[in-house]
Amino acid sequence: MRLSDFDFELPEELIAQHPLAQRQASRLMVLNRVTQQLQLAQFADIADWFRPGDVLVVNDTRVIPARLIGRKQTGGRIEVFLVRRLPGVEEVWACLTKCSKSPRPGTRLILGEGLEGTVVEGGEPPYRHVRFSFQGDFSQVLEQVGRIPLPPYIRREATPDDRSRYQTVFAREAGAVAAPTAGLHFTDEILDVLRAKGVEIQPLTLHVGLGTFLPMRTDDITEHRMHEENYFVPEGTAAAVNRAKDDGRRVIALGTTSTRTLEYAVDEQGRLQAGAGTCDLFIRPGFKFRIVDGLVTNFHLPCSTLLVLVAALAGREFILEAYQRAVAEKFRFFSYGDCMLIL
């Protein structure tokens, strides 16, 4: 398939620049893969489409204030964007840097009160590896000196409101540089309604990386290579998902990040495996889903890996038809936009 097969016209004014006043106030489009029909609804009523016994798998990653503004030891201004923590006991991160002259290994960075960095060897362009020095807890230091990294299509500076609204209500594990945005619609009240209906809600963690915004640069989508992201599947989640599959109950993934993690961590026998690792799975049409029966997701960019993923689940023509309808109905797109449920 060609990249152009996943293109569509999107008016700029439909790209949501701010969240709605209430999380659950978004609109919802429901796609039935069997009947090839779609319905328009309100997200607040999403529980109506769940059944007792369904398992909803959520990504509990927490967005960190990954944008750091500081200066090099020579005095020049530098912006450091944390992308992914590297394995090890020290806080060494793959980072993107923006400055007049790219820093070399050994360059010291002053990044705010109580936080310094040193550029170390390693890192394939455009990334630099930076080892951070600080007192206390790294995540708390970041909360004090870092800035929330809004996506590039949100054309404004982050505000204090984004610190809470660009997080899900179930965010627990710090490490993402972008939110798992399908989860932004959920409130504690909606989660309680789902539980009362008999829906199991199980967490996993995938720390969303900057690559989620990177465009595909190959016309043949099979040549695209996904970025790596750190993930963790708890024992309890693996057990709950495997029981559901054994019983013929549905597993519904909240977001493309949960989908990719579930389908990456499954073994040859179709059993979800608990544990940690790095995920670089690219799901495209022709992929055989072994865990995921349904998906809650936002409306994605044209020609993006995320749009390709939802097309793999629901069918390319059906998805593009749905997106055309969403544009006509003036649905809001991308991170702070409206929502889709694929069943």
UniProtKB/Swiss-Prot annotation:
Entry function: Transfers and isomerizes the ribose moiety from AdoMet to the 7-aminomethyl group of 7-deazaguanine (preQ1-tRNA) to give epoxyqueuosine (oQ-tRNA).
Top-rank lineage group of the source organism: Bacteria
Listed SUPFAM superfamilies: QueA-like
This protein's name: S-adenosylmethionine:tRNA ribosyltransferase-isomerase
Enzyme class: transferase
InterPro entries to which the protein is assigned, alphabetical: QueA, QueA_dom1, QueA_dom2, QueA_sf
GO biological process: queuosine biosynthetic process; tRNA wobble guanine modification
Assembly and interaction partners: Monomer.
Enzyme Commission number: 2.4.99.17
A single cellular component GO annotation: cytoplasm
One GO MF term: S-adenosylmethionine:tRNA ribosyltransferase-isomerase activity
Catalysed reactions, semicolon-separated: 7-aminomethyl-7-carbaguanosine(34) in tRNA + S-adenosyl-L-methionine = epoxyqueuosine(34) in tRNA + adenine + L-methionine + 2 H(+)
Subcellular location: Cytoplasm
Keyword Nuclease included in the entry's annotation: no
Pfam family, one: Queuosine_synth
Pathway where this protein functions: tRNA modification; tRNA-queuosine biosynthesis
Keywords of this entry: Cytoplasm, Queuosine biosynthesis, S-adenosyl-L-methionine, Transferase
Family of this protein: Belongs to the QueA family.
